[in-house]
A protein has these predicted regions:
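Post-His helix in hydrolase/transferase enzymes
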Residues: 177-194
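Edge beta-strand at a domain terminus
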Residues: 345-358
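Short beta-strand/loop motif that positions the catalytic acidic residue
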Residues: 132-133, 138-141, 145
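Alpha/beta-hydrolase fold active-site neighborhood
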Residues: 1-127, 131, 212-215, 219-337
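Active-site-adjacent alpha-helix of alpha/beta-hydrolase-fold enzymes
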Residues: 150-165, 172
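Acidic/polar loop patches that form or flank catalytic/metal-binding clefts of enzymes
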Residues: 165-168, 197-207
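Conserved alpha/beta-hydrolase "acid-adjacent" motif
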Residues: 11, 146-152
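Histidine-bearing beta->alpha loop at or near hydrolase active sites
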Residues: 170-177
Length: 358
Protein backbone atom coordinates (compact mmCIF):
# COMPACT_ATOMS: atom_id res chain seq x y z
CA UNK A 1 0.00 0.00 0.00
CA UNK A 2 2.88 2.37 0.65
CA UNK A 3 4.06 1.73 -2.89
CA UNK A 4 0.54 2.22 -4.25
CA UNK A 5 0.26 5.56 -2.48
CA UNK A 6 2.55 6.94 -5.16
CA UNK A 7 -0.33 6.68 -7.61
CA UNK A 8 -3.27 6.87 -5.19
CA UNK A 9 -3.46 9.72 -2.71
CA UNK A 10 -6.40 7.96 -1.03
CA UNK A 11 -3.82 5.71 0.61
CA UNK A 12 -2.18 8.75 2.16
CA UNK A 13 -5.62 9.83 3.42
CA UNK A 14 -6.31 6.65 5.38
CA UNK A 15 -3.10 4.72 5.99
CA UNK A 16 -1.73 6.35 9.14
CA UNK A 17 -5.01 6.24 11.05
CA UNK A 18 -5.78 2.74 9.75
CA UNK A 19 -2.39 1.41 10.86
CA UNK A 20 -2.77 2.97 14.30
CA UNK A 21 -6.23 1.42 14.64
CA UNK A 22 -4.66 -2.03 14.22
CA UNK A 23 -1.59 -1.44 16.35
CA UNK A 24 -3.28 0.42 19.20
CA UNK A 25 -6.79 -1.07 19.29
CA UNK A 26 -6.64 -4.33 17.33
CA UNK A 27 -9.19 -2.83 14.92
CA UNK A 28 -8.38 -4.10 11.44
CA UNK A 29 -11.49 -2.94 9.54
CA UNK A 30 -10.01 0.33 8.19
CA UNK A 31 -6.75 -1.28 7.06
CA UNK A 32 -8.46 -4.27 5.43
CA UNK A 33 -10.76 -1.97 3.50
CA UNK A 34 -7.83 0.14 2.37
CA UNK A 35 -5.98 -2.96 1.19
CA UNK A 36 -9.05 -4.16 -0.71
CA UNK A 37 -9.49 -0.89 -2.59
CA UNK A 38 -5.76 -0.36 -3.18
CA UNK A 39 -5.36 -3.03 -5.84
CA UNK A 40 -2.33 -2.14 -7.94
CA UNK A 41 -2.82 -1.73 -11.69
CA UNK A 42 -1.15 -4.98 -12.71
CA UNK A 43 -2.85 -7.16 -10.10
CA UNK A 44 -5.82 -7.86 -12.36
CA UNK A 45 -7.85 -6.53 -15.24
CA UNK A 46 -7.79 -6.77 -19.03
CA UNK A 47 -4.49 -6.64 -20.88
CA UNK A 48 -5.90 -3.81 -23.01
CA UNK A 49 -5.93 -1.67 -19.85
CA UNK A 50 -2.48 -2.65 -18.57
CA UNK A 51 -0.12 -5.34 -19.84
CA UNK A 52 2.05 -6.75 -17.05
CA UNK A 53 4.03 -8.66 -19.68
CA UNK A 54 4.83 -5.52 -21.63
CA UNK A 55 5.71 -3.74 -18.41
CA UNK A 56 8.28 -6.33 -17.33
CA UNK A 57 9.71 -6.45 -20.87
CA UNK A 58 10.28 -2.70 -20.81
CA UNK A 59 11.58 -2.90 -17.25
CA UNK A 60 14.14 -5.58 -18.08
CA UNK A 61 15.26 -4.12 -21.41
CA UNK A 62 15.24 -0.37 -20.79
CA UNK A 63 15.74 0.22 -17.07
CA UNK A 64 19.15 0.15 -15.38
CA UNK A 65 19.60 -2.90 -13.16
CA UNK A 66 21.65 -3.68 -10.06
CA UNK A 67 23.50 -6.32 -12.08
CA UNK A 68 24.92 -6.82 -15.56
CA UNK A 69 22.19 -7.98 -17.96
CA UNK A 70 24.89 -9.40 -20.26
CA UNK A 71 26.13 -11.73 -17.50
CA UNK A 72 24.95 -15.28 -16.83
CA UNK A 73 22.09 -15.67 -14.31
CA UNK A 74 24.40 -17.04 -11.60
CA UNK A 75 26.70 -14.03 -11.94
CA UNK A 76 23.71 -11.69 -11.89
CA UNK A 77 22.49 -13.21 -8.64
CA UNK A 78 25.88 -12.69 -7.01
CA UNK A 79 26.03 -9.10 -8.25
CA UNK A 80 22.51 -8.43 -7.01
CA UNK A 81 23.26 -9.88 -3.57
CA UNK A 82 26.33 -7.67 -3.31
CA UNK A 83 24.33 -4.59 -4.35
CA UNK A 84 21.66 -5.27 -1.72
CA UNK A 85 24.28 -5.92 0.96
CA UNK A 86 25.88 -2.55 0.20
CA UNK A 87 22.67 -0.61 0.84
CA UNK A 88 22.58 1.42 4.09
CA UNK A 89 20.19 0.13 6.74
CA UNK A 90 17.91 3.17 6.37
CA UNK A 91 17.73 3.08 2.56
CA UNK A 92 14.00 2.32 2.66
CA UNK A 93 13.15 3.62 6.14
CA UNK A 94 10.88 3.03 7.96
CA UNK A 95 11.09 -0.38 6.27
CA UNK A 96 14.15 -2.56 6.47
CA UNK A 97 16.14 -3.27 3.34
CA UNK A 98 14.98 -6.90 3.37
CA UNK A 99 11.32 -5.93 3.76
CA UNK A 100 11.45 -3.59 0.81
CA UNK A 101 13.54 -5.57 -1.68
CA UNK A 102 11.50 -8.75 -1.07
CA UNK A 103 8.15 -6.99 -1.40
CA UNK A 104 6.11 -8.60 -4.21
CA UNK A 105 5.29 -5.16 -5.56
CA UNK A 106 8.94 -4.40 -6.35
CA UNK A 107 10.94 -5.85 -9.24
CA UNK A 108 14.52 -5.34 -8.10
CA UNK A 109 15.27 -9.00 -8.79
CA UNK A 110 12.62 -9.46 -11.48
CA UNK A 111 15.08 -9.59 -14.34
CA UNK A 112 17.63 -12.03 -12.88
CA UNK A 113 16.47 -14.73 -15.28
CA UNK A 114 15.57 -12.50 -18.21
CA UNK A 115 17.38 -13.31 -21.50
CA UNK A 116 20.50 -11.30 -22.20
CA UNK A 117 20.12 -8.70 -24.94
CA UNK A 118 21.18 -9.98 -28.36
CA UNK A 119 22.24 -6.50 -29.46
CA UNK A 120 22.96 -3.19 -27.79
CA UNK A 121 19.91 -0.96 -28.09
CA UNK A 122 19.99 1.61 -25.28
CA UNK A 123 16.77 3.60 -24.88
CA UNK A 124 18.78 6.83 -24.84
CA UNK A 125 21.89 6.94 -26.99
CA UNK A 126 22.73 10.65 -26.97
CA UNK A 127 24.04 13.09 -24.39
CA UNK A 128 22.20 16.08 -22.92
CA UNK A 129 20.67 18.22 -24.22
CA UNK A 130 18.52 15.46 -25.68
CA UNK A 131 16.19 17.62 -27.79
CA UNK A 132 16.82 20.58 -30.10
CA UNK A 133 16.44 24.03 -28.52
CA UNK A 134 13.47 24.67 -30.81
CA UNK A 135 11.47 21.71 -29.47
CA UNK A 136 9.44 22.61 -26.35
CA UNK A 137 9.01 19.89 -23.72
CA UNK A 138 6.63 20.05 -20.74
CA UNK A 139 7.57 17.86 -17.77
CA UNK A 140 4.97 17.52 -14.99
CA UNK A 141 5.77 15.88 -11.64
CA UNK A 142 3.46 15.05 -8.75
CA UNK A 143 4.72 16.21 -5.37
CA UNK A 144 3.47 12.96 -3.78
CA UNK A 145 4.61 10.66 -6.59
CA UNK A 146 6.99 8.04 -5.20
CA UNK A 147 7.01 6.00 -8.43
CA UNK A 148 8.51 8.65 -10.69
CA UNK A 149 9.55 11.21 -8.12
CA UNK A 150 9.57 14.94 -8.67
CA UNK A 151 13.35 14.94 -8.32
CA UNK A 152 13.48 12.51 -11.25
CA UNK A 153 11.25 14.82 -13.26
CA UNK A 154 13.52 17.76 -12.55
CA UNK A 155 16.53 15.76 -13.76
CA UNK A 156 14.69 14.74 -16.95
CA UNK A 157 13.86 18.36 -17.74
CA UNK A 158 17.50 19.35 -17.24
CA UNK A 159 18.63 16.55 -19.55
CA UNK A 160 16.12 17.56 -22.22
CA UNK A 161 17.72 20.98 -22.43
CA UNK A 162 16.77 24.65 -22.17
CA UNK A 163 13.60 24.22 -24.22
CA UNK A 164 12.07 22.05 -21.49
CA UNK A 165 9.96 23.34 -18.61
CA UNK A 166 9.48 21.39 -15.40
CA UNK A 167 6.45 21.96 -13.17
CA UNK A 168 5.99 20.35 -9.77
CA UNK A 169 2.29 19.82 -9.03
CA UNK A 170 1.98 19.87 -5.25
CA UNK A 171 -0.07 17.32 -3.28
CA UNK A 172 -0.54 15.18 -6.39
CA UNK A 173 0.36 11.56 -7.04
CA UNK A 174 1.50 9.72 -10.19
CA UNK A 175 0.23 10.89 -13.62
CA UNK A 176 -0.77 14.43 -12.77
CA UNK A 177 -2.99 15.35 -15.72
CA UNK A 178 -5.39 12.37 -15.63
CA UNK A 179 -8.23 12.13 -13.09
CA UNK A 180 -7.33 15.71 -12.22
CA UNK A 181 -10.06 17.10 -9.92
CA UNK A 182 -8.49 20.56 -9.78
CA UNK A 183 -7.98 21.05 -13.51
CA UNK A 184 -4.47 22.41 -13.03
CA UNK A 185 -2.15 19.83 -14.60
CA UNK A 186 -4.70 18.90 -17.26
CA UNK A 187 -5.15 22.59 -18.09
CA UNK A 188 -1.41 23.05 -18.44
CA UNK A 189 -1.24 20.12 -20.86
CA UNK A 190 -4.10 21.48 -22.96
CA UNK A 191 -2.56 24.95 -23.16
CA UNK A 192 0.81 23.43 -24.05
CA UNK A 193 -0.66 21.32 -26.85
CA UNK A 194 -2.61 24.30 -28.21
CA UNK A 195 0.33 26.74 -28.11
CA UNK A 196 3.60 24.86 -27.54
CA UNK A 197 5.65 27.90 -28.52
CA UNK A 198 4.28 29.72 -25.44
CA UNK A 199 5.36 27.01 -22.99
CA UNK A 200 7.63 29.22 -20.89
CA UNK A 201 5.04 32.01 -20.74
CA UNK A 202 2.17 29.86 -19.43
CA UNK A 203 1.04 30.69 -15.89
CA UNK A 204 1.61 27.51 -13.87
CA UNK A 205 1.08 29.03 -10.42
CA UNK A 206 -1.94 26.76 -9.86
CA UNK A 207 0.50 23.88 -9.37
CA UNK A 208 1.64 25.33 -6.05
CA UNK A 209 -1.93 25.83 -4.81
CA UNK A 210 -3.28 22.28 -4.96
CA UNK A 211 -4.87 21.60 -1.54
CA UNK A 212 -3.32 19.15 0.84
CA UNK A 213 -4.52 15.55 1.16
CA UNK A 214 -6.64 15.68 4.30
CA UNK A 215 -5.56 12.68 6.34
CA UNK A 216 -8.05 10.94 8.62
CA UNK A 217 -7.20 11.68 12.24
CA UNK A 218 -8.67 8.57 13.80
CA UNK A 219 -10.86 5.60 12.98
CA UNK A 220 -12.66 5.26 16.34
CA UNK A 221 -14.40 1.95 16.89
CA UNK A 222 -17.17 3.37 19.08
CA UNK A 223 -18.91 6.69 19.52
CA UNK A 224 -17.41 7.32 22.95
CA UNK A 225 -13.91 7.19 21.44
CA UNK A 226 -14.63 9.77 18.73
CA UNK A 227 -13.16 13.25 19.13
CA UNK A 228 -16.10 15.65 19.57
CA UNK A 229 -16.66 18.55 17.21
CA UNK A 230 -15.72 21.95 18.63
CA UNK A 231 -18.72 23.85 20.02
CA UNK A 232 -19.57 27.10 18.25
CA UNK A 233 -21.62 30.10 19.29
CA UNK A 234 -25.15 29.10 20.27
CA UNK A 235 -24.31 25.49 21.01
CA UNK A 236 -26.13 23.89 23.93
CA UNK A 237 -25.42 20.27 23.03
CA UNK A 238 -23.17 18.24 25.30
CA UNK A 239 -20.16 16.05 24.50
CA UNK A 240 -22.28 13.17 23.20
CA UNK A 241 -24.07 15.45 20.76
CA UNK A 242 -20.77 16.86 19.55
CA UNK A 243 -19.45 13.33 19.04
CA UNK A 244 -22.57 12.50 17.02
CA UNK A 245 -21.81 15.56 14.88
CA UNK A 246 -18.23 14.43 14.33
CA UNK A 247 -19.28 10.90 13.40
CA UNK A 248 -21.98 12.17 11.03
CA UNK A 249 -19.50 14.40 9.21
CA UNK A 250 -16.93 11.60 9.09
CA UNK A 251 -19.47 9.22 7.54
CA UNK A 252 -20.31 11.72 4.79
CA UNK A 253 -16.64 12.49 4.14
CA UNK A 254 -15.84 8.78 4.07
CA UNK A 255 -18.54 8.12 1.47
CA UNK A 256 -17.20 10.96 -0.69
CA UNK A 257 -13.69 9.51 -0.46
CA UNK A 258 -15.01 6.10 -1.52
CA UNK A 259 -16.66 7.61 -4.64
CA UNK A 260 -13.32 7.54 -6.45
CA UNK A 261 -13.14 3.74 -6.10
CA UNK A 262 -16.73 2.72 -6.86
CA UNK A 263 -17.21 0.58 -9.97
CA UNK A 264 -20.88 1.60 -10.01
CA UNK A 265 -23.36 3.55 -7.93
CA UNK A 266 -23.32 1.60 -4.65
CA UNK A 267 -20.89 1.58 -1.75
CA UNK A 268 -20.67 0.26 1.79
CA UNK A 269 -19.93 1.97 5.08
CA UNK A 270 -16.78 1.24 7.01
CA UNK A 271 -18.51 -0.99 9.56
CA UNK A 272 -21.85 -1.71 7.85
CA UNK A 273 -24.54 0.18 6.06
CA UNK A 274 -24.78 1.31 2.47
CA UNK A 275 -24.77 4.42 0.37
CA UNK A 276 -25.64 5.22 -3.22
CA UNK A 277 -24.32 7.90 -5.55
CA UNK A 278 -25.65 9.45 -8.73
CA UNK A 279 -24.78 12.41 -10.90
CA UNK A 280 -21.70 14.14 -12.25
CA UNK A 281 -20.41 16.84 -11.82
CA UNK A 282 -22.95 17.30 -9.02
CA UNK A 283 -22.89 14.05 -7.04
CA UNK A 284 -25.89 13.15 -4.90
CA UNK A 285 -25.28 10.68 -2.09
CA UNK A 286 -27.81 8.82 0.06
CA UNK A 287 -26.63 7.10 3.23
CA UNK A 288 -28.63 4.28 4.80
CA UNK A 289 -27.55 2.89 8.14
CA UNK A 290 -23.92 3.76 7.52
CA UNK A 291 -21.70 2.92 10.48
CA UNK A 292 -18.45 4.85 10.65
CA UNK A 293 -18.34 3.65 14.26
CA UNK A 294 -19.85 0.34 15.29
CA UNK A 295 -22.52 1.70 17.64
CA UNK A 296 -23.97 4.62 15.66
CA UNK A 297 -25.84 4.79 12.35
CA UNK A 298 -25.92 7.66 9.88
CA UNK A 299 -28.86 8.17 7.51
CA UNK A 300 -29.45 11.06 5.15
CA UNK A 301 -28.37 12.80 1.97
CA UNK A 302 -25.43 14.83 0.77
CA UNK A 303 -24.57 16.84 -2.33
CA UNK A 304 -21.02 17.24 -3.60
CA UNK A 305 -20.14 19.59 -6.45
CA UNK A 306 -17.04 18.28 -8.18
CA UNK A 307 -16.38 21.61 -9.88
CA UNK A 308 -16.73 23.98 -6.93
CA UNK A 309 -15.95 21.49 -4.15
CA UNK A 310 -19.04 22.54 -2.18
CA UNK A 311 -20.44 19.82 0.09
CA UNK A 312 -23.77 20.05 1.92
CA UNK A 313 -25.49 17.30 3.89
CA UNK A 314 -28.52 16.61 6.04
CA UNK A 315 -28.24 13.52 8.22
CA UNK A 316 -29.62 11.85 11.30
CA UNK A 317 -27.14 10.14 13.58
CA UNK A 318 -28.41 7.57 16.10
CA UNK A 319 -26.10 6.32 18.83
CA UNK A 320 -26.31 4.01 21.84
CA UNK A 321 -28.74 4.62 24.69
CA UNK A 322 -31.15 6.62 22.55
CA UNK A 323 -28.64 9.36 21.74
CA UNK A 324 -29.53 11.03 18.46
CA UNK A 325 -28.88 14.17 16.44
CA UNK A 326 -30.45 15.73 13.36
CA UNK A 327 -27.81 17.75 11.56
CA UNK A 328 -26.98 19.99 8.65
CA UNK A 329 -23.38 20.36 7.60
CA UNK A 330 -21.29 22.08 4.95
CA UNK A 331 -17.69 22.46 3.82
CA UNK A 332 -15.64 22.97 0.68
CA UNK A 333 -13.76 19.91 -0.48
CA UNK A 334 -11.37 21.95 -2.62
CA UNK A 335 -10.32 24.42 0.06
CA UNK A 336 -6.98 24.52 1.83
CA UNK A 337 -7.34 23.36 5.44
CA UNK A 338 -11.14 23.69 5.23
CA UNK A 339 -13.46 23.60 8.24
CA UNK A 340 -16.89 22.00 8.31
CA UNK A 341 -19.81 23.71 10.01
CA UNK A 342 -22.49 21.60 11.67
CA UNK A 343 -25.83 22.82 13.00
CA UNK A 344 -28.96 21.06 14.21
CA UNK A 345 -30.30 19.49 17.37
CA UNK A 346 -28.92 16.77 19.61
CA UNK A 347 -30.77 15.42 22.62
CA UNK A 348 -33.40 18.13 22.17
CA UNK A 349 -30.83 20.92 22.40
CA UNK A 350 -29.46 23.26 19.72
CA UNK A 351 -26.14 22.14 18.30
CA UNK A 352 -23.62 24.41 16.59
CA UNK A 353 -20.11 23.18 15.94
CA UNK A 354 -17.09 23.19 13.69
CA UNK A 355 -14.48 20.57 12.89
CA UNK A 356 -11.77 19.99 10.29
CA UNK A 357 -13.47 19.01 7.05
CA UNK A 358 -13.37 15.22 6.70
Amino acid sequence: MVNNAGSDSGVYRDLDAAARAVLERDDDAPLLRLAAQSIYTDDSGPVTDFSAGLYIAVFCNDYPQAFDMAAAPATRRAQYAAAVAALPDDAFAPFTVDEWVTSPIEEFDGCLGWPSPVRSDPPIAGRPPLVPPTLPVLVLSGGLDTLTTWTDGEIVAEQMGPSARWVKVENTAHVTALADPFGCASGLVRRFVARPERLHAVDASCAARIPEVRAVGEFPRRLAAADPASPARGNLAGPTGLRLAAVGAAAVGDAIARWWYLPGSKGTGLRRGRFTVRGDPVVHLRLRGVRFVADATVDGTATWNLDSGKVTARVRVAGPGGAAATLRMAWNDKGRHPSATVTGRAGGRPLAATLPAP
